[in-house]
A protein has these predicted regions:
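Terminal RNA-binding accessory module
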Residues: 1-70, 74, 334, 338
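Rossmann-like S-adenosyl-L-methionine
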Residues: 2-9, 14-17, 196-422
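Short, acidic/hydrophobic/Gly-rich beta-strand patch recurrent on exposed beta strands
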Residues: 21-26, 137-141, 319
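Extended interfacial segments that mediate partner engagement and assembly in macromolecular machines
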Residues: 58-70, 77-175
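Short, solvent-exposed loop/turn elements at beta->coil junctions and helix N-caps
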Residues: 113-120, 178-180, 400-405
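Nucleotide donor/acceptor-binding cores
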Residues: 125, 186, 281-282
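Internal alpha/beta scaffold segment
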Residues: 146-177, 181-186, 193-216
Length: 422
């Protein structure tokens, strides 16, 4: 059994989804922070659990050719990224391997298409930054401490400039966070502890950054806050932005769920609609539809009837406006719990939260008996659990398509098609 502060020389066998190296010491698993496959390292044990331990690198004795110097001064502290110490190939291979091993672990036979990663920097069209002592940043790993930084390679340059400007202008106020979205314009929303007048800030902001098309504000004293629970007040503009994706225009309000990586999202949506293959006269359900993205794309490309269901009322209001703006009439949208949907359907798209489908949702799918289920997931583990829960009635009929939707982080998305067993 290894002990804290003991030093070992090890060879790294693989890299896990969190960007850490994996090795064994006398058959005991050790995760080594920021180590790469094939590297020979001197390590120090930092934490010991019953079945595994964590270690830090003391020295790299043999370095991987795929190692890169992180282009971020706060990488070792910030909890945002996991793969800045490697090239993008290592990350893509690791994420592809993680998805494959998850299906294998769950004893689901599948084939896999090569992971899709069209862009790996400056892709984030949405950020929530937290205020520290003098500036904004992301949370430190495993804590709520703020790691301040002026630049982030995942963000648009304008986000970095606006966050620095905001930190300077609102210093001394009750500022606690800054929420920004980029689409046809930029939405900026400072979040405070107390009600705050930002008229002067708003005027200077829009003068210096003409791309800012709308400014909102919110305040809350809650220790942990979620955007969907905040009450937003529009200070300038109309309170929303528009994004064009897959040929359609979508309204995005502050609470709207919308993928942060447009380039990759478009490729995922195109594949999902291809697998859905909506036919004339069919009834299609887009469950967990959010602002209606995939359902409206499907409706715009077919003569099927599409039902969009989402539990968040504000998202359905946006979805209805999106349908109207894109002149899509073969769609019905309703704010409700997806597990209570009861209309006859031929096929459906499901894009559940990270925890996967509830038992009620699984029961609903088995009761509705759609011929095809296109499943989009941000969590391979829960995707596999749900596939197994449906396996008495449905079989995997497509390869597993994997998307690096959040490059440099530990997250990955997948999409599959399940077909009803005759």
């Amino acid at each position: 059994m290894v002990k804290i502060n003991e030093i070992y020389t090890v060879e790294i066998e693989e890299v896990n989804i969190f960007g850490n190296g994996v090795c064994h010491i006398d058959s005991f698993v050790v995760f080594v922070g920021r180590a790469l496959k094939g590297e020979k390292c001197k390590i120090r044990i930092s934490r010991v659990q019953s079945r595994y331990a964590y270690a830090d690198i003391v020295d790299i004795l043999e370095k991987s050719p795929k190692r890169e110097a992180p282009r971020c001064s706060v990488y070792e502290k910030c909890g945002g990224c996991s793969f800045l110490h490697s090239n993008i190939d290592v990350e893509n291979e690791t994420k592809q391997s993680f998805v494959k091993s998850t299906f294998k672990k769950n004893k689901i036979k599948a084939s896999f298409e090569e992971i899709v990663c069209p862009v790996n920097e400056s892709y984030r069209n949405k950020v929530v930054l937290f205020y520290g002592k003098n500036g904004f940043g992301y949370n430190e790993k495993s804590t709520i401490n703020v790691v301040e930084h002026e630049t982030c390679i995942l963000n648009d340059d304008d986000f970095d400039k606006i966050s620095k400007f905001t930190a300077d202008k609102l210093k001394g106020s009750s500022i606690r966070a800054l929420y920004m979205r980029r689409a046809n314009g930029i939405m900026v929303c400072p979040i405070f502890y107390e009600q705050t007048n930002i008229s002067a800030y708003c005027k200077e902001l829009t003068e210096q950054f003409p791309k800012v098309s709308t400014v909102l504000k919110a305040h809350t004293k809650d220790k942990d806050f979620a955007l969907e629970k905040l009450k937003f007040e529009t200070v300038l503009g109309n309170g929303y932005v528009f994004e064009t994706i897959c040929g359609l225009e979508f309204k995005i309000s502050p609470r709207s769920f919308f993928q942060v990586n447009k380039s990759c999202a478009e490729k995922l949506y195109e594949k999902a609609i291809e697998l859905l293959n909506p036919q004339e006269g069919e009834n299609i359900a887009d469950l967990f539809c959010g602002t209606g993205t995939m359902g409206l794309i499907a409706a715009s490309r077919s003569k099927s009837t599409v039902y969009g269901v989402e539990i968040e009322p504000s998202a359905i209001l946006d979805a209805k406006e999106n349908a109207k703006a894109n002149k899509i009439e073969n769609v019905e949208l309703e704010a409700m719990d997806a597990s209570k949907f009861d209309k006859p359907i031929d096929a459906c798209i499901i894009d559940p939260p990270r925890k996967g489908c509830s038992s009620f949702m699984i029961d609903t799918l088995l009761r509705l008996k759609p011929k095809r289920i296109v499943y989009v997931s941000c969590n391979p583990d829960t995707m596999c659990q749900d596939i197994k829960s449906l396996s008495a009635e449905y079989e995997l009929s497509s390869p597993v398509y994997t998307y690096n939707m959040f490059p440099r982080t530990s997250h990955v998305e997948s999409v599959v098609c399940l077909t009803k067993i005759n």
